Amino acid sequence: MTERGGFEALDTCVHCGFCLQACPTFLATGDEADSPRGRIDLMRALEAGELAPDDPALRLHLDRCLGCRGCEPVCPSGVGYGRGIEAARALLATRRRPSALARVALWALTSPGTSRIVYALARMLRASGIPSWLAGWGRFRFAMGMLAATKGGGRRWKAVKGGERTPASTAPDRSRPPSSALLFRGCVMDGLFAHVHDATVRTLGVNGWAVREVPGQVCCGALHAHAGLREEARRLARANVAAFGDGAEPIVVNSAGCGAMLKEYGHLVDAAGFAARVRDVTEVLAAGGGPRPGAPVDVQVAYDPPCHLLHAQRITDEPLRVLAAIPVLRVVSFADAAQCCGSAGLYTLLEPAMSRAVLAPKLASLRTAAPQVVATGNPGCVMQLGAGLAADGVAAAVRHPVELLDESYRAAGYYA
């Protein structure tokens, strides 16, 4: 971390305005202060001492930032907006703690002891079916929809008749030992999306990877960094670096938000070697010749790229290559797919009105595209899109791409 703590990443901004149409909050409000360009002015003033940390306008517009980083790929000057906004939030957090709701959410979702109880209770509630019945608009009903969306399974698509057997040309190669990879489990993924971890291990196994779990790993620290709690994020980062050690094995992640954070450890705690090993599961599957083909699955899928996969990690084609390994499956395009869904970690809880405003145009586009499944690679996006679609009465499931590949492989006979 540099002496200026990340503010220097904003220095190259020349106020060209290319970022405006890439910013979901600017599109929602039309307010320059809710754009990256406007926020950079505010952050520069904060660093220079021209604005006090308790300035209401400063906090309003910085708190409204989703941190989606959609402005970064379109910026011709290479502004590191993501690092800048986290530096600003870290400075603000030294003067004012995050809100009570943010602190409670962090405690419930990421602290090891408490989160185990919280996730166990959430899984029990999810299994009861009550969240699905209560899903809708409004804070409580939307939260129920988010929980219902984490269930996974419940197949709404079928393998094409006659496609159940594995073609000889695609049978797993047992002539050489598998390569070794390490799985990063995370907190939300481990608590509510264990089925995605299982699908990750199985699909990687078909493609020649033996996946091991690593004891001692903890939360990636993304939610803490976004809240300005940089020292807590560093503590978690150091624990993960120590847990995974100095080997060369890739660290596989199936959460875009976690992956983006782990790849920032080089800047956060000078762990560039660790960061270089981090790979999204779709990167690993798509490497070389791409994933082995599975059985045909007759389903229409809309791929929604998570912001922290598309903008932060610049991963674009790999998830589509994973879906392309499923014969017959059709990927349909829809307008504004690259725009944020409004989830953004705790943002959907802390800024519900803006979160729903950002989500609205994406829901409208998905209604028009009419997919049977929306595929996306981040837990917050699965929950946000699942809750929004349910509230809107759209009968589309939301799944991680590896879940679809897993169904195809199961139908092909790679495993029972």
Language-model features: locations:
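Short, intrinsically disordered, charge-biased short linear motifs at domain edges
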Residues: 1-10, 51-62, 205-208, 326-331
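Signature of N-terminal electron-transfer/Fe-S-associated modules in redox systems
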Residues: 11, 29-30, 45-50, 54, ...
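Iron-sulfur cluster-binding electron-transfer modules in prokaryotic oxidoreductases
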Residues: 81-416
